[in-house]
Amino acid sequence: MKLEQLLEGVSYTLVQGSLELDIEDIIYDSRKAAPGRLFVCIVGTQRDSHDYAAQCVADGVTALVVQHDIDLSTVPGAAVLKVESSRYALALMSGNLFGNPSRRMTMIGVTGTKGKTTTTHMIKSVLEAAGRKVGMIGTNGIYFLGHHQETANTTPESYELQKTFREFLDAGCDTALMEVSSQGLMMDRVAGIHYDIGVFTHLSPDHIGPGEHKTFEEYRSWKGQLFKRCTTGVVNIDDENTEALLEGHTCKLVTYGCSEKADYRAGTYQLLRTHDFLGVQFHVSGKDDMDVKVNMPGEFSVYNALAALTVGKVLGLPDEAIHEGLGRCVVKGRVELVPISRKFTILLDYAHNEVSTESLLTTLRAYDPHRLVVVFGCGGNRSKLRRYGMGEICAKMADFSILTEDNNRFEKVEDIIADIRMGMNKGNPDAKFVEIPDRLDALHYAVDHAQEGDLIAVIGKGHETYRDREGVKTPFLERELLEEYAQQIGLE
């Protein structure tokens, strides 16, 4: 592709060289420098890649995009283009390089502090029940037409994002569905993308601190940017931050919630539980009239399902597809049941801090189990406050806890458990718990000592497939390990 074509839509100044160059690829990692490539110099939080421009040119890079002045004598022969924001330019050029695939698919973006992952999976399930071919990007990875691959970020860098959209399109997808993080919006990873539907789930203080957002107001403002980049906004009208988040929105709004003012509203919900089902059932009224059954527990599942249902209605999908899609949706590592016994219920969840743990245990307690049992640990080389907090919450809310490892990294598991124990003692000096450092042994213990009617939550890892000890990651798939052990001991 000619450099001039690659720059379509980008505001730039040609500082040096020609626009008639042929560009084979775009890079923003100097280690990938090679002839025929364009290097985008980005100012990061840790380093400024403008410092690597000269070496990239020496390694054959044909053109440079810069955000501030560089010494032109160090980059002879290369085209140099100056832009106001390198990240923004990278996003637009990446779209051009891959033929702007997002313009040829239905685009759906989901944002919020909690609920993004589950809601995107629910939307995907509804769309597929209606016959749509869907590509999905989010916390759990990239999914399309039977393929799955991991991602480093909830919202990948713009180049990877556009490349993935191209893969979706080439594979025959007609819809791209993605989680849109505040970082993805702030860092221009989704610049140049217009969404047909933007979805807002929920907002609470998170991602506030160095390298993220300075204040909650800034965090909320960036979330709200999605609703200046979409045609229709599907929003949770019950959230206290909705009005402020939508300030300056340019899209049509369709609302969901439990309040009377919602376009699609849920009535009183009923909790449903068997050994292999933990969910809710509720009636939807307002602009529709239908019963919904969801294979996920708690009030938050009602809201997530309402969001998916509303997206389906905006797209004109039949009620049968919406009902079927919501009923069969399962999200890996999010209240994921492992049906290995009729005697008790065991599930996996990614809850890994005190807020998500308290939310999960509150939800599970509502199902009135014989005992609420929690298997958990905390990550090594991470905040000790999380250990105290999770210990305190579990001591207060669980009937029995099994303290174990969770990616120790370079810390001793005994030290981590000691910190958790301090939180347990603070939360409830009479809390019942046992310490089993090896997580596999802890899983076996939970199964061996399960009582009739117990609800066992194995939390912290969720969708993760590894165990990290001393920086070495080895396979650790909790669902498979539980199923293998149940078969080994002949569990019924």
Where are each of the predicted segments found?
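N-terminal leader/targeting and accessory segments in enzymes
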Residues: 1-92, 228, 269, 293, ...
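Acidic, Mg2+-coordinating active-site environments of NTP-dependent enzymes
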Residues: 7-9, 70-77, 171, 196-346, ...
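Short glycine-rich anion-binding loops that position phosphate/pyrophosphate groups of nucleotides
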Residues: 44-46, 182-183, 204-207, 239-240, ...
